[in-house]
Amino acid sequence: MDEFHXYGKEDSSWQQCFLYPLFFQEDLYAIYHDHYLDGSSSSESMEHLSSNDQFSFLTVKRLIGQIRQQNNSIVFFLNCDPNPLVDRNKSFYYESVLEGLTLVLEVPFSIRSKYSVEGMNEWKSFRSIHSIFPFLEDKFPHSNYILDTRIPYSIHPEILVRTFRRWIRDAPSLHPLRSVLYKYRNSPDNLQRSIIIAPRVNTRFLLFLWNHYVYGCESILVPLLKQSFHPRSSSHGSFPDRTHFDRKIKHIIRNSRRNSLKSIWSLKDPRIHYVRYAERSIIAIKGTHLLVKKCRYHLPIFRQFYFHLWSEPYRVCSHQLSKNCSSSLGYFLRVRMKPLLVRTKMLDELFITDLITDEFDPIVPIVPIIGLLAREKLCDISGRPISKLYWTSLTDDDILDRFDRIWKNIFHYYSGSLDRDGLYRIKYILSLSCAKTLACKHKSTIRVVRKELGPELFKKYFSKEREFDFPAFSSKAAARSQRERIWHSDIPQINPLANSWQKIQDLK
């Protein structure tokens, strides 16, 4: 693999034209075989090992050779023996073929994405979730409209094959991909007759298809939007001081109406920012309402003509940040006006000036979170705490750890909101539900539980000091958190509660 990467750097045409021989390299399937044995620790994998002690690479090669045959039911095992052990072995070889196909196709894709990231003027994709919230905090106050779009996930298999043909010239390597996609499309379980890819799937093959599909869409869409919204203008470069710039230009070229209109249009300086997480993408726009309507109209047309995807108009929603909120990433996103008092001293006089600035203010959806906690049997619909009867068989430390873990995850994810009164309401619900669970386990009351365990035990698990991971500066961090938002860097993904609430919002 390392040698192949080296050859790809020296000659980019070689890595695009000679992919098919890599399907017959045993090392690729050995990588997946070792990964499968090391990564799976379930009882199902142990049963599989007992029924299949030896892994034959020759069998994998024969399966690869049969992929290009017309009757490939032997490979994809749609008409296979009903014996469960045989089915498990065949499905294991089928997964091995898919993993080998994925490993081969990932090599040129990884090289291309690496070069695009290293480029100075290239658009950088595939950032982590840690950079999304600071990006929104930095760019949203300078925008007045947002477009909330959903990327279609039901795709015809031939569209995926054509996207690979744009940068892979090796036609034989695309035949196995086409066979796999069409076989999955025509399977009896697939009623929609299309490939359904999503960012939350478990298989590596579908994850790779999703990443490649999104990369192909964004690599064309984002530079095109930036080029349209950032035209080159000579008016801005020749004036380093832009104070009252609009007024100066109007005064200088008042006689020439045509030039004045051009200059005023360039001074509006429309901007666009793009961010995506999973299948939801947000386009923040600084411009007029007419410009937003044009973008909302042209986005489905762009996807239809470039990628042959029919995107329904209702999938693109526009919101004005100063009036409406947009639900995304488990937050209600909005921009509010923040007044500031600025003291200016000139000679012996002191002036106080009121300034109004826009501030990114995400809102915590308290009512939906309470509804999701009620679904988990931690409270009722009105937010009244109840005992978790399913956890009464655990030890006291395990019960406290589970409730504390739920609170810590919720607080860390929603710590970016300055209005935390609702969060402390969630904390009260969880702490009281924990006390009721312990009281139900010991067959006593909440007062007796608090008296026996002591208030220090609840302070240890539900204290404000544990909300911050700054042992040397815990007091300073707690004081600073009351007036500043802190985005915690230990968030690996979107919160499960926020994810569930977002799915409910999408259904609405």
Curated annotation (Swiss-Prot):
GO cellular component term, pick one: chloroplast
Covalent S-S links between cysteines: none
Subcellular location(s) of the protein: Plastid, Chloroplast
InterPro entries membership: Domain_X, Maturase_MatK, Maturase_MatK_N
Pfam families, per the entry: Intron_maturas2 (PF01348), MatK_N (PF01824)
GO molecular function: RNA binding
Keyword Heme applies: no
Keyword field: Chloroplast, mRNA processing, Plastid, RNA-binding, tRNA processing
GO biological process entries: mRNA processing; tRNA processing
Organism superkingdom: Eukaryota
Keyword field contains Transmembrane: no
Family membership noted in the UniProt record: Belongs to the intron maturase 2 family. MatK subfamily.
HAMAP family xrefs: MatK
Protein's job: Usually encoded in the trnK tRNA gene intron. Probably assists in splicing its own and other chloroplast group II introns.
Protein name stated in the entry: Maturase K
Gene source species: Abies bracteata
